[in-house]
Amino acid sequence: MEILKYLLILSLPIIALFISKKYSAFVDSILERARGYYLFLCHIERMLGSYLTPPHRLGDGFSHPSLEDMMMRISAGDSLIDAYRACCGSLPSSVDETLTEFFSDFGKGDVSLELRRVREAISRIDAALSVEGAEGEKQKKICSVIAPSLAIGLVIWMI
């Protein structure tokens, strides 16, 4: 029975470190997905600024690991909002609201209106990314301190 106690004591810090690393990777993946959408909107802005592109061709020439499913859906003929809803994943709420609004109304105006809307969406997402990036770093630091501290506290309590 004593050996199980010591195995548990040894495993708690390792488990805490694992949880901390997993949470950090989760936060990073959310921010990376949001950055991917930011880059996609920049790509749409360039496409609209240079020539008229049908919606199913907006993903041409764009590649981002987080958005591969969405690009396949767009090239298959899904509307931007349908492709986004099917593939959006976890995103900060402000980014999700901006993208939902933009993709829902995309193609309902002339080129100048669409350019204005995409530039507005880009600036809103850029602002959200800077806020969410700083907040994500804080959350990762807190988790990297709290999880091992709790593990150490449990180890001390068990001894």
Set out the residue ranges of the language-model regions.
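Short, Lys/Arg-enriched charge-dense amphipathic segments
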Residues: 1, 67-79, 136-140, 152-159
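Juxtamembrane/interface alpha-helical elements of multi-pass membrane proteins
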Residues: 2-75
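Bilayer-spanning, highly hydrophobic alpha-helical transmembrane segments
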Residues: 6-19, 132-159
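Generic signal for short, ordered secondary-structure residues
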Residues: 16-19, 23, 97, 104, ...
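Sparse, context-dependent recognition of short Cys/His-centered cofactor- or disulfide-binding micro-motifs
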Residues: 19, 33, 91, 103, ...
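Short hydrophobic/aromatic segments of transmembrane alpha-helices and their interfaces
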Residues: 37-38, 80, 145
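Glycine- and small-hydrophobic-enriched helix-loop-helix hairpins
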Residues: 43-121
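Membrane-interface, cytosolic juxtamembrane amphipathic helix immediately N-terminal to a transmembrane helix
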Residues: 105-149
